[in-house]
Amino acid sequence: MVPTIIYSAILALSAFTPSVFAQTRSSGCGKQPSLANGVHNINGREYILKVPDNYDKNKAHHLVFGLHWRGGNMWNIVDGQSIQPWYGLETRAQGSAIFVAPNGKNAGWANYGGEDIAFIDAIIKQVESDLCVDQSSRFATGFSWGGGMSYSLACSRAKQFKAVSVLSGGVISGCDGGNDPIAYLGIHGINDGVLPFQGGVNLAQKFVRNNGCQQSNVGTPQPGSRGSVRTDFKGCSKPVSFIAYDGGHDAAPLGVGSSLAPDATWRFFMAA
């Protein structure tokens, strides 16, 4: 068992002071960066950083978190086996984003006492003090437990993140707060036997309410069609969409080569 590291409330609060969020450009803008691509460590926990090849220290970049599934690790986000690298988002970003893949504790995101939220807070603080980030353009996505952690971020960090994309998620990393609006995309297989489809719908419905959207039923594809149906909720203060696809509990909906989740996620992020 990996020893539990308790992050103090001071750490979490120091990462997000009101003065930080009054500005758009991070304090790392204009600096010669010291953080390089590869593995970095904060208080015994690791994350992988990917900075664009054409990184410009004076240009504010999107910041995108890719969160792994249960039994996985940060390397699964970048190795291109179960999913396209970085959930297919790096190629679509075309050098406009900095990517982070944190490593979950004990191969997951139990988020005991908010420790995983505090870890992500600390990563943001470290990255943004060294690199040029648009602080109004932070995003998170993940599959399964990584989706649950993305949902947890939507609950407790809606004012710090612009949007999340939750792939086959559930309420498995907690939902501290959970009353603020945030742009929310859910993607879920209708035959998911691990985290049921209706649970994914319920996650989205929370932000339908938070964002003041008009209530609407979620469309579903015909079983066996290998298709998908997207529902865009109307009247929202921040967008909420849900994609139901003909599949199960899949890290890459409709297959690793499918553009469904990568295209939908990146376009949703950029339109949020």
Swiss-Prot record:
Superkingdom, natural source: Eukaryota
E.C. designation(s): 3.1.1.73
Enzyme class of the recorded protein, top EC level: hydrolase
Main localisation: secreted
Catalytic reactions on record: feruloyl-polysaccharide + H2O = ferulate + polysaccharide
A molecular function GO annotation: feruloyl esterase activity
Any one GO cellular component localisation term in the record: extracellular region
Record's subcellular location: Secreted
SUPFAM superfamilies in UniProt: alpha/beta-Hydrolases
Segment forming the signal sequence: 1-22
Key words, A-Z: Carbohydrate metabolism, Hydrolase, Polysaccharide degradation, Secreted, Serine esterase, Signal, Xylan degradation
Biological process according to GO: xylan catabolic process
Role noted for this protein: Involved in degradation of plant cell walls. Hydrolyzes the feruloyl-arabinose ester bond in arabinoxylans, and the feruloyl-galactose ester bond in pectin. Active against paranitrophenyl-acetate, methyl ferulate and wheat arabinoxylan.
Similarity field: Belongs to the faeC family.
Name this polypeptide is given: Probable feruloyl esterase C
Organism of origin: Aspergillus fumigatus (strain ATCC MYA-4609 / CBS 101355 / FGSC A1100 / Af293) (Neosartorya fumigata)
